[in-house]
Design a protein with these regions (language model features):
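Sec-dependent bacterial lipoprotein signal peptides
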Residues: 1-28
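Short N-terminal leader segment in a subset of presequences, especially plant chloroplast
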Residues: 8-13, 38, 139-143
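Generic detector of solvent-exposed, compositionally biased contiguous segments
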Residues: 12-16, 23, 79-81, 151, ...
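Bacterial Sec-dependent N-terminal signal peptides
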Residues: 21-44
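Extracytoplasmic cysteine-anchoring/structural motifs
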Residues: 28-35, 87-183
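Residues that flank catalytic or metal-binding motifs in active/ligand-binding sites
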Residues: 37-39, 59, 82, 113
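Structural motif
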Residues: 44-56
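Tryptophan-paired
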Residues: 57-108
Length: 183
């Protein structure tokens, strides 16, 4: 019986192409979840400054969740912030946060505001690799009104779009200028 001779140089391009195809296939499944698949509420802070509504930075404000498992402090209050991620609970239709002034001037007065989001949540299948994500439809937003004047969710839904989807309007002690003349 005669053995067939295999030309190893002829097999090299075939093996190389097969290996590259395998690497590319594995790369597709890992890159599938790089995009933002979860609805993560992103809040921007606003206030009236010199008669105009504009984005503001808030100094010395601690933000933490109520009833959240583990460490729920989202801002220690040790730096000025103009926006913040406020994750919603997926095991409940309500999420609450406390916004508390902690600077030396206001701390003795214990000035804090509780912000409550009431929503419905809808799980959406993304893929086998990524699992599911949630979309939140806002039903109501409540605040105790000490620091926060009002809150808006433009569109009423929080999806996985990478945008500021919550506007928190702080009391700044100024009233907005509603005049149409900018003279």
């Amino acid at each position: 019986m005669q053995k067939a001779k295999i030309n190893r140089l002829a097999l090299f391009p075939i093996l190389l192409l097969g290996g590259m195809a395998g690497l590319m296939q594995g790369g597709c499944s890992t890159e599938e979840c790089y995009d933002n698949r979860n609805a993560l509420p992103y809040a921007g802070f606003y206030g009236v400054m010199e008669g105009k509504m504009e984005q503001i930075s808030v100094d010395s404000i601690r933000v933490y969740g109520i009833g959240a498992p583990g460490d729920s402090i989202l801002s220690e209050g040790n730096r000025s912030i103009a926006n913040l991620y406020l994750p919603f609970r997926i095991d409940s239709d309500t999420t609450q946060y406390v916004f508390k002034l902690i600077n030396k001037l206001y701390e003795p007065y214990n000035i804090a505001d509780t912000l409550t989001f009431i929503y419905s949540r809808e799980a959406r299948f993304v893929s086998a690799a990524c699992g599911a994500s949630y979309v939140y439809t806002i039903k109501d937003i409540k605040t105790t009104g000490l620091l926060i004047d009002s809150v808006a969710v433009p569109g009423g839904r929080i999806t996985n779009a990478d945008v500021e989807n919550i506007h928190i309007y702080f009391n700044t002690g100024e009233d907005p200028d509603y005049s149409e003349d900018d003279e």
